[in-house]
Amino acid sequence: PLGIPTMKDRAMQALYLMALEPIAETTGDRFSYGFRKKRRTMDAIRQIDTVLNRQHSPEWILEGDIKGCFDHISHDWLLNHIPMDKTILRKWLKCGAVFNGKLFPTEEGTPQGGIISPTLANIALDGLQPLLAERFKRLWRNNKTFHYKVNLIRYADDFIITGRDKELLENEVKPIVIEFLKERGLTLSEEKTTITNIYDGFDFLGFNVRKFGKRLYTSPSKDAQKRFRAKIGDIVKGHKMCKQESLIRMLNPVITGWGNYYRYGASTDAFHGCDNHIYNLTKKWACLLYTSPSPRDY
């Protein structure tokens, strides 16, 4: 459930967050981008481009998926590692949630509706990047520099780890990640955690990232396009009898927001496809509203 704190608790959390956030920013992983000031999803995508769009870039990617990150973070770990008043933190973590007049206790996790929860989750997940950097640092072999090509890029609880080859990620990197998360009460989803070749592509933050030849391309993922088309369809089909200006007023923010998010990268084909979809939907809507001939007669 989405736990929403009371107004008093929200004010208290905001006060403690003012002191905790600078510490989290100072000690946080360098390439962590979620729930941090002056960082956004595009910064994470840009870092992926920096890492993978080079001549000798890594070609294998571990896509990590954490099972219910906010719901399963260990309270003991948070109480032992978060630099704030332990009594207050314990009360926030253990307060539970009230639904239909019944109290549901919380023995693990941090309420997703809490102002301070994203920072607590970030602190819990910070530390993996330096751990990997120390374990897989550059070596000098046979008068040559040997690179493991291990890089971590994280946005909140979504992350990818690059590697020199599939065996390195499967046999050495993945066990380290599993042990790191286990200490925090978290686990990787075996079904959703995959190792992919860059030429096959992978999805991250709504983008599909894939290499063709020597160039890296980012474009809206198929799932992102499907969700966008479904949302447009729901708006149009749910307002069959509204005025034209009302429908336009409802569609514009959705279209503009989606277009602005995906305007960077190779999005032309996706934009054309979605534009055609919107045209067909609104054309049918207009024909039904104004009792014109069937759309196929146009």
Each model region followed by its residue ranges:
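Non-catalytic, peripheral interaction segments enriched in hydrophobic/basic residues
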Residues: L247-L289
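Short acidic (Asp/Glu) and glycine-rich catalytic loops that position anionic groups and cofactors
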Residues: A24-G28, W60, G101-F104, Y155-A156, ...
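Single conserved hydrophobic/aromatic residue that forms the stacking wall/gate
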Residues: Y290-Y298
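Duplex nucleic acid-engaging cores and interfaces of nucleic-acid transaction enzymes
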Residues: K8-Q13, D49
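Active/ligand-binding-proximal structured segments within catalytic/core domains
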Residues: M12-L20, L120-A121
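A conserved non-catalytic segment of reverse transcriptases
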Residues: K94, R184-R249, V254
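Charged boundary/loop elements
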Residues: M18-G34
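Conserved polymerase palm-domain catalytic core
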Residues: R30-F31, I45-G201
